[in-house]
Amino acid sequence: MKISLVVPVFNEEDTIPIFYKTVREFNELKEYEIEIVFINDGSKDATESIINKIAASDPLVIPLSFTRNFGKEPALFAGLDHATGDAVIPIDVDLQDPIEVIPHLIEKWQAGADMVLAKRSDRSTDGRMKRKTAEWFYKLHNKISNPKIEENVGDFRLMSRAVVENIKQMPERNLFMKGVLSWVGGKTDVVKYARAERVAGDSKFNGWKLWNLALEGITSFSTFPLRIWTYIGLFIAGMSFLYGAWMIIDKLIFGNNVPGYPSLLVSVLFLGGVQLIGIGILGEYIGRIYIETKQRPKYILKRKGFKSEI
């Protein structure tokens, strides 16, 4: 039985040898044929040469290298495209997702699950701000989007070959893999685990990338941000009508002077701000439509094995 590990890497020269040694020396995985698909996402350090050196001595290691940094989501998709195992497990190279969890994922899969989620029961290794923003994101996403995504579940999970083939059919270029993996469905089970510290190096996923990923997740699976502006427009129109009616009554019945310039200025600035926000959200969706219509590939490979490829 072949199990494929999909491992995106970006400037991870320190962690790759540790990850590889840990996988190959873990006794509970020796009964399986463990394929490792490394995806080098445009690294600037020695990542590519390290991967190629490992692959030269291990036929079960598939080295893929992008022509530039395309991002983690395309890297995951590339790994799924090239993995050949009966089951596929995306996993981070920093070993924050422990190798010891993999046999439990395989056990649930062999019991009949199409997808087995690895759920973090302890995120104490993450900073307080990261934990809080992740909590807010999950709540917002699951409130306004469909399908829902399991809280505290990253990319670390096991997928059957059937699930992987279904994912590979999806044509979109703007990828939010957590949503994509939830969208395909199938019988799902969960394994809980405590997340560990990084074995070496620093995380390459900064706050700006997390923010963009959150936007991608919401705009890829929800039209609520567009729909809400219909309700905001109706509310503002209703309030404007009531305010106008009050000014007429106040003038005709009570004889009070209607304030002119200040109220007009406030109204114009308020409506202008609301419109700019609405246009910005609309622009996010139009930008994604524009990218999709160009039908560019999700990624371009510089290297597959030892042959140049595009």
Swiss-Prot record:
It is found in: Host membrane. The chain crosses the membrane at residues 229-249, 263-283. Signal peptide: none annotated. One of its GO terms (cellular component) is host cell membrane. It comes from the Viruses. Keywords: Glycosyltransferase, Host membrane, Membrane, Transferase, Transmembrane, Transmembrane helix. One of its GO terms (molecular function) is glycosyltransferase activity. Gene3D superfamilies: Spore Coat Polysaccharide Biosynthesis Protein SpsA, Chain A. The keyword Transcription regulation does not apply. Its EC number is 2.4.1.-. It is a multi-pass membrane protein. Its main location: host cell. InterPro entries: Glyco_trans_2-like (IPR001173), Glycosyltransferase_2 (IPR050256), Nucleotide-diphossugar_trans (IPR029044). Belongs to the glycosyltransferase 2 family. GtrB subfamily. Involved in O antigen modification. Catalyzes the transfer of the glucose residue from UDP-glucose to a lipid carrier. This is Bactoprenol glucosyl transferase. It comes from Salmonella phage P22 (Bacteriophage P22). The lineage of its organism: Viruses, Duplodnaviria, Heunggongvirae, Uroviricota, Caudoviricetes.
